Amino acid sequence: MASVQKDPILQVETTCGSLLFELQIIWDEVGETETDRDQMLLELERECLEVYRRKVDQANRCRAQLRQAIADAEAQLAAICSAMGERPVHIRQSDQSVGSLKQELGRILPELEEMQKRKVERRNQFIVVMEQIDSITNDIKGQGELVHSEPLIDETNLSMRKLEELHCQLQVLQKEKIDRVETIRKHLCTLYSHCSVLGMDFNEVVGQVNPTLSDPEGPRSLSDHTIEKLGAAVQKLMEVKIQRMQRLQDLATTMLELWNLMDTPIEEQQEYQHITCNIAASEHEITEANSLSEDFIKYVEAEVVRLDEVKASKMKELVLKKRSELEEICRKTHLLPVSDSAIDQTIVAIESGIVDATMVLEHLEQHISKIKEEALSRKEILERVEKWLSACDEESWLEEYNRDDNRYNAGRGAHLTLKRAEKARNLVTKLPGMVEALASKTIVWEQENGIEFLYDGIRLLSMLEEYNILRQEREEEHRRQRDQKKLQGQLIAEQEALYGSKPSPSKPLGGKKAPRMSTGGASNRRLSLGAAMHQTPKPNKKADHRHNDGALSNGRRGLDIAGLPSRKQSMNPSEMLQSPLVRKPFSPISTTVVASKANIATTTTQQLPKNNAVNEISSFATPIKNNNILRNLEEEKMMTMMMQTPKNVAAMIPIPSTPATVSVPMHTAPTPFTNNARLMSEKPEVVEYSFEERRLAFMLQSECRLV
């Protein structure tokens, strides 16, 4: 009974039977039909089959998984053994009793774990060796620590044979690294020696080759490029050392020669004994620090330069003395001396040793003797030239003297000036003959010597020819001025014949002479055109203000600058209406009167004295009959001009004639008070001109002066 209870299948069957019996009882009570009962029983059987089928499938899958795990473990174990180059440790025997799948898997897994541990250890050995190989390779290639990636390992080949090959490769690289380190060390030692002798900074030189070499504790580049640059730096410093050694030996040789030449004392030579002792030394024998540095060579060069200066100082003094002698001779004979730049270049060449000073001195002696011979042949002509130049100076002084209007004024030393002027006139009369004689002498000299006679670098004949041309031009100018004065005299005579002679200026109306304002003779001469001035009454403040405003107008200022007369405004407006001769703008004007008036104005302006500060106020009258005749002539002339072509009209436009009495703007002084009736009787009649007419008159008047 106990065995039955222990059997689970029997227990299940018993349980199922009891449950089925209990189900029958329930169906009986319910009253289920047999068909329904059979159908329900079929469903129960079907459900039981499904449960069994699921359980069977699950068991099959578990068996397949165990078999796959065993196969995978065996494959991994075989791959590891193959990669490590060892014989597989798990080989299934066909005659061997096979246990369950779980037992077989349990036997394989420990072996697999053991082989995996061995593979990891072998792989780590490969990594260590390959990292060392990569490090040395990077040092040789000059990459240093730039590459930090893990080395690539072939997982399929981790055999001991491969590991031994890597160890051999590592040993070869280590040996090459040692050789490169030794080569770099030798180069660095050589560089240090050269830098010490040449006075250079070792770290700076090495840093230019490769910055890693200047750090003694850090890693250094062992690449071929670094070694090549080190070798090039060593070679370059060797060449610099040889060049400086040759320079120093040349300086020492020159120093010995200068010492022997100038008998330098032994005490002074002892200071540079360590330099002269290496005069025949080779490159390897010079090892003293800074013995070939730039500062030391400059120090020796400075001493050699000082000795050269001492040597050349006396030669320079001789050359300068000869040059001064040559310049003095050339100055006295009016010859062009040797240029200072050429002498300076010669002195520099002597100081540098390019030219022998003895040869230069001989050349200067020959040149001085040649200049002296030429000076003897030029002596007579030079004396005549000095006389001619002195006469030219007197001629210039005489011209200035003749242009002085005050030359005849009595004063201190006037009689001496007159005597000098008389002597100058006598000397000027001899100038043409003097120039002709000098030119003939010069031509003869040039024919005899075959060269041009130069006076301070200019040919003397050219100077004489230029002087003759200038003299002729001055004579023509004087002749033209005399003709112009003669013509002006004729015009004045015609004016006097037409208008009569100019009356003397009227005296001031008052008993007291009016004070004159000093405004400058040049301004008054410009404003005065030969017409008489009228006296103005003393204005009040209000009228004076109006007068000043009118004087500042643009039209009046333009006429004042042009030198033409402007209309004087009256103080009383009624006086303007009483003037019967006020002319409308652009009315006909007489050409003959205009020309005569312009000539009179020019002559009067030229004859005014320089010391006259203000023109006196005066007036003169012209008969009215003459004005009527002039008006008729002007109308006829204007009709003739209108018949001409436009091209000829501009040439025939007459200058506006100046009326008989014209008021010219000028600075006037106040006069004593007079009554208005007297002023009305004495006030001149004014003819009004437009601005265009006055400007045209000024232009034509300027053309007449030029002619």
From Swiss-Prot:
Give positions of region: Disordered.
Answer: 495-574
Phosphoserine PTM sites in chain numbering:
S504, S528
UniProt feature coiled coil, ranges: 49-84, 157-179, 269-289, 354-374, 464-486
Site features described as Microtubule binding, chain residue numbers: A410, A421
GO MF annotations in UniProt: microtubule binding
> Which Pfam families does this entry report, sorted A to Z?
MAP65_ASE1 (PF03999)
Q: Which Gene Ontology cellular component terms are annotated? A: cortical microtubule; microtubule; nucleus; phragmoplast; preprophase band
InterPro entries per record: MAP65_Ase1_PRC1 (IPR007145)
GO annotation (BP), single: nuclear division
* Superkingdom in the source lineage: Eukaryota
What is its biological role? Answer: Microtubule-associated protein that plays a critical role in organizing the mitotic microtubule array during both early and late mitosis in all plant organs. Essential for the cytokinesis, especially in roots, by maintaining the integrity of the overlapped microtubules in the phragmoplast. Required during root morphogenesis. Needed for giant cell development during root knot nematode infection, where cytokinesis is initiated but not completed.
Protein name, as recorded:
65-kDa microtubule-associated protein 3
Source organism per UniProt:
Arabidopsis thaliana (Mouse-ear cress)
List the lineage, top down: Eukaryota, Viridiplantae, Streptophyta, Embryophyta, Tracheophyta
